[in-house]
Amino acid sequence: MTKEFHHVTVLLHETVDMLDIKPDGIYVDATLGGSGHSAYLLSKLGEEGHLYCFDQDQKAIDNAQVTLKSYIDKGQVTFIKDNFRHLKARLTALGVDEIDGILYDLGVSSPQLDERERGFSYKQDAPLDMRMDRQSLLTAYEVVNTYPFNDLVKIFFKYGEDKFSKQIARKIEQARAIKPIEATTELAELIKAAKPAKELKKKGHPAKQIFQAIRIEVNDELGAADESIQDAMELLALDGRISVITFHSLEDRLTKQLFKEASTVDVPKGLPLIPEDMKPKFELVSRKPILPSHSELTANKRAHSAKLRVAKKIRK
């Protein structure tokens, strides 16, 4: 791993091992990031196996081309620079219409958080950006400075689950009427100023939830995850598995709901026989989410909110 792209992989063994890797299988890492999951997965593949890696951040791909070089030389890896919401179309274009397993590590990777100029962090002074794909048009600056008051309230409440969403949106509206809000620290101070003193004494940074909300809006994270996970579940071969790591309640709720819909059947109680085409196509590999071990939590504080859910395809 290059120094510029240092990333500690969360739930490394659990995420990959739960895919029940076949040496000659076709797999997808939908969120390449620091390439930790990819490297471990590739170590389990034989010469006939192949891994397709998606990331919309060119730096992640550049880093992986160094760290995964031995597998690249053997022709076992294909990198695809794109949002994972286009996963099905991109794989189909490469002649891949069925996969044996796929993993997602949702959210922002550590290098993106740590790279000051990306504007993801409320702890470092930087321009308001928050784009995972540097070529996309919508930035945090546009959201903060051009979205109407009601839209800001909606985003803050829906994606940040912040009970002071109205007060924060009002404070932003007042500030930007005087001059544009340009920096992360400037926004963080406005958020703090909008909250009552007793709220500021609580654990955690007061701007965390609002920064999360803006980041989700800029990158359409939930919409992309919803589309991509559903497409991935369609692409899975019989006995294929999907692993999804989430870091906040919105992602986890989405994943849990998609897995629940695919693994349960909605028919009247007492029906003697369930028609074959109505039987669930998936089963949950683990009923409850898998959490990081105590040792992992000690070694990596960013793992504390991680949850892993895994499902297996049992019918085509």
Swiss-Prot record:
Keywords: Cytoplasm, Methyltransferase, rRNA processing, S-adenosyl-L-methionine, Transferase
GO MF term list: rRNA (cytosine-N4-)-methyltransferase activity
Localization terms from the record: Cytoplasm
Gene3D superfamilies per record: Putative methyltransferase TM0872, insert domain, Vaccinia Virus protein VP39
Disulfide bridge positions per record: none
Domain of life according to the entry: Bacteria
GO CC terms: cytoplasm
Assigned EC number: 2.1.1.199
BP-aspect Gene Ontology terms: rRNA base methylation
Binding-site residues for S-adenosyl-L-methionine, renumbered to this chain: S35, G36, H37, D55, F84, D105, Q112
Catalysis: reaction(s): cytidine(1402) in 16S rRNA + S-adenosyl-L-methionine = N(4)-methylcytidine(1402) in 16S rRNA + S-adenosyl-L-homocysteine + H(+)
InterPro entries membership: RsmH, SAM-dep_MeTrfase_MraW_recog, SAM-dependent_MTases_sf
UniProt record similarity statement: Belongs to the methyltransferase superfamily. RsmH family.
HAMAP family on file: 16SrRNA_methyltr_H (MF_01007)
Cross-referenced NCBIfam families: 16S rRNA (cytosine(1402)-N(4))-methyltransferase RsmH
Functional description taken from the UniProt entry: Specifically methylates the N4 position of cytidine in position 1402 (C1402) of 16S rRNA.
The protein's name: Ribosomal RNA small subunit methyltransferase H
